[in-house]
Amino acid sequence: MSNIKLIVGLANPGAEYAQTRHNAGAWYVDLLARSHNQSLKEESKFFGYTARINICGHDVRLLVPTTFMNLSGKSVVALASFYRIQPDEILVAHDELDLPPGVAKMKLGGSHGGHNGLKDIQNKFGNNPNFYRLRIGIGHPGDKNKVVGFVLGKPPASEQQLIDDAIDEARRCTDILMKQDMDKAINRLHSFKASV
């Protein structure tokens, strides 16, 4: 069984960013909330939108920061400190350039890989990288100079469908994670690849 008590979906705030690739983590958290008949509500003391759900008998808080991506740690640490949640009890969902659309992977710890949201969370936890990550594939533009425009762009419908399918499978694997264990959730998620 997992000890996850907080699931975070990284995003940039505002309607202009809502449908951009960089907000894939928030899409996952929003789906989790909706699948448990909850809606995210703004809580200014946590600098984000929050909800509380029950996954397979486990009390879990959801968070989508309203800070910009590179300040995500401020929001995550505010909520984690208030509820005494440790880094290894947190799952952070984020967009991943190194995975194609239609693929998602989970892991504990590791490098931030240049992702500004992960980097800030790690820094705010005193350079502690030992939180879980859900990496949602968005693909790569093929040129590092085009990355910013790519992550802040909206995916075409075919790519969006692949990303949505991977997020839906990640949601199903979240139940496995909470009720059984990380290895089973990882094995199932890592064997999944959406196709058009």
Swiss-Prot record:
TRNA binds at Y17, F68, N70, N116. InterPro entries: Pept_tRNA_hydro (IPR001328), Pept_tRNA_hydro_CS (IPR018171), Pept_tRNA_hydro_sf (IPR036416). The record marks N12 as: Discriminates between blocked and unblocked aminoacyl-tRNA. Pfam families: Pept_tRNA_hydro. Hydrolyzes ribosome-free peptidyl-tRNAs (with 1 or more amino acids incorporated), which drop off the ribosome during protein synthesis, or as a result of ribosome stalling. Catalyzes the release of premature peptidyl moieties from peptidyl-tRNA molecules trapped in stalled 50S ribosomal subunits, and thus maintains levels of free tRNAs and 50S ribosomes. PANTHER family: PEPTIDYL-TRNA HYDROLASE. This is Peptidyl-tRNA hydrolase. It comes from Photorhabdus laumondii subsp. laumondii (strain DSM 15139 / CIP 105565 / TT01). The lineage of its organism: Bacteria, Pseudomonadati, Pseudomonadota, Gammaproteobacteria, Enterobacterales. The gene is pth.
